[in-house]
Regions:
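C-terminal "cap" of GNAT-fold acetyltransferases
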Residues: 112, 119-121, 139-164, 259, ...
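Conserved GNAT acetyl-CoA-binding A-motif
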Residues: 77, 106-117, 246-258
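Conserved acetyl-CoA-binding loop-helix of GNAT-fold acetyltransferases
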Residues: 85, 91-104, 130-131, 231-244
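Conserved beta-strand-loop-alpha-helix junction that forms the acyl-donor binding cleft
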Residues: 86, 115-125, 144-147, 252-265
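Conserved beta-strand in the GNAT
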Residues: 51-53, 60-69, 77-79, 84, ...
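A short beta-loop-alpha structural element at the N-terminal edge
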Residues: 2-17, 154-172
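Active-site rim helix/loop that mediates acceptor-substrate recognition in acyltransferases
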Residues: 27-52, 56-57, 64-66, 174-198, ...
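Conserved active-site alpha-helix within GNAT-family acetyltransferase domains
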Residues: 92, 96, 108, 120-138, ...
Length: 285
């Protein structure tokens, strides 16, 4: 018999152990030691009281649905930061039951919509979410680069700043070609501000480009250049500086909107490979 309950009283170490077990055969290799899991959850706005665990007769955690909650596109929203079931308990309806439990729970909290991302080739998961009423919002592409493959050619002086203030953000968002996904949003960056390095290029005292990288994981949540200054090497100069700021050997840019030809071409010219495609999906509650 499986019991469903929130995970607010479950140690993060136990959640991590089940997380690693559940994703051991995942389509994308997961490099997620405990510290990285904790940072990921902090960045995405994880709320244990809104997250569901599936427990067997021995009270062992065999599945989880970890939710974040924050305002998103003008609505109080929940975001699925990770859903998994260990191999020996799959195909028993546990994921569907966790979702139903979570949906009722977050509705009681006043949540208006449920947001998630799913790998497009994960057909069973895509089918499950569609059956639950989720609709596809956007197509995303993910990119990866071996740091050793990149040849630095900086043309512009790059500065590092300690944090991006609200007034600076108001200028930087003008450079965007698309709205960042949940995990790459301003709120997510601010939630884990000390885990990032921030690089900017200025011309005559005005910022014309910026980039942000996770010091440990090598994840770049945002990089953009003023449309009036593109094609001059500013983006490449920023990227070169970002690579110096991370311990990681693999650099990742996740959830690039498939419609953004400019961003995709920029990454491919830097030497990135496109390795995964995802759907951004949402459900109105």
């Amino acid at each position: 018999m499986i019991i469903y309950n929130t995970v607010e009283n479950i140690a993060i170490e136990k959640i991590h152990s089940t997380f690693i077990d559940a994703f051991s055969d995942y389509q994308v290799k997961m490099d997620l030691p405990l510290l990285k899991l904790q940072q990921m959850l902090k960045r995405r706005g994880y709320v244990a009281a809104a997250s569901i665990g599936a427990f067997n007769d021995d009270a062992f955690l065999v599945g989880f649905l970890l939710n974040a909650i924050r305002p998103w596109n003008g609505k109080l929203s929940a975001y699925d930061t990770g859903t998994g079931v260990i191999n020996s308990y799959r195909n028993n309806g546990i994921t569907s039951n966790m979702f139903l439990s979570a949906k009722e729970l977050i509705k009681e909290m006043g949540v208006e919509q449920y947001v998630l991302e799913v790998i497009q080739s994960n057909t069973p998961a895509v089918s499950l979410y569609k059956k639950q009423g989720f609709e596809i919002l956007r197509d995303f592409e993910c990119f990866i680069l071996d740091k050793n493959r990149f040849k630095a050619m900086p043309k512009y002086k790059v500065q590092n700043i300690k944090i991006i203030t609200e007034s600076i953000w108001l200028e930087l968002i003008k450079f965007w070609d698309f709205m960042p996904s949940w995990q790459n949003s301003i709120d997510s960056i601010n939630a884990a501000a000390d885990t990032f390095k921030y690089s900017i290029v200025s011309i005559e005292g005005t910022i014309v480009g910026y980039g942000i990288i996770d010091i440990i994981t090598g994840d770049i949540p945002q990089i953009a250049v003023d449309k009036n200054h593109r094609g001059n090497g500013i983006g490449k100069s920023i990227f070169t500086d970002l690579l110096k700021s991370t311990e990681a050997d693999s650099i990742k840019v996740l959830n690039v909107d498939s419609k953004s030809t400019a961003m995709k071409n920029f990454l491919l010219k830097l030497g990135f490979d496109q390795n995964v495609k995802q759907y951004e999906m949402s459900l109105k509650l």
